[in-house]
Amino acid sequence: MYTVEACPCCQSKKSQGRWAIVAPFLAHYAVERPPSLCKLLECSVCSFRFFDARLTPEEVARLYSGYRGERYFAERHRWEFWYSRQVNDGIGGDPEEIALRVAALEKLFLPHVNNGKVKAVLDYGGDRGQFIPKSLGIDKFVFELSDAEPEPGVNRIGSEQELNSMKFDFIMALGVLEHCSEPASVLEQLRSCLNPGSLLCIAVPYERYGVGFAGKGRLYRSYLNALLHFPAALVAVDFYSAAARIRLNHIPPLGLVKCHEHLNFFNNTSMTILLERTGFEVVDSKIECVAKYPARVESLYILARLR
């Protein structure tokens, strides 16, 4: 892992930080070292939240190769006993959730897209390509780091080199940028793959849970350091914190914030600034409910066009 100080969206170095930990699962599975302290930062300029700890390309490859497969599930369940087989297998595979996400996507882009002009569609980081609306485009492609088998009618792009040689009329990146250590670099790559006048649709979780009980000072840092030396206590506090965050949308007293797969927490302002900085202009945006299990989940959808 490496650390950053500047906001990945607006590049400001003015921020407020709270102590957090690198999740035990992430530390052992991807980083291959014991969990450690990090910080959750909130940019004072654009209100973007992000962890200062970022994954290297090698760590990303370890995390997403065989994503949600047997080894992934076993290691994550070891450190997060509440992460069940039902949750693991249901992510991206629940027909109701897929329908909700596709409907949210169509609600955003249909008023702005001439389907007759959309030939090639890319779902970047799109698992099996199951979220590509059937009505959109003729040639459908998915670029995915995991080993997921594409849906019928969806063509898998096998490498960065192949992707960079192609052009598309519509690109989707749903549930991607929250995972990225360098989101601006990803958007710059996608910009180079778009035909002139084409559209990019971004969706990210809209996660703005309360962090008031996560401390900034030495006392809270010492508390987290003590937890790191007692794995059973760390797992217990992690469970307590996750339950409060999911049910109450707040980190509880003596709870903790952990750096997990989501490194970034966008709102409309920060996403707009990031898109404009990387050569896009925002066309439309919406916040939509996209899942109801194990709790209500909202996503921020933004449609952007090349400037």
Where are these regions (language model features)?
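Acidic-residue sensor for enzyme active/binding pockets
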Residues: 144, 178, 261
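Residues lining the SAM
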Residues: 174-177, 203
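Conserved N-terminal segment of class I S-adenosyl-L-methionine
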Residues: 1-174, 185-187, 286-290, 295-303, ...
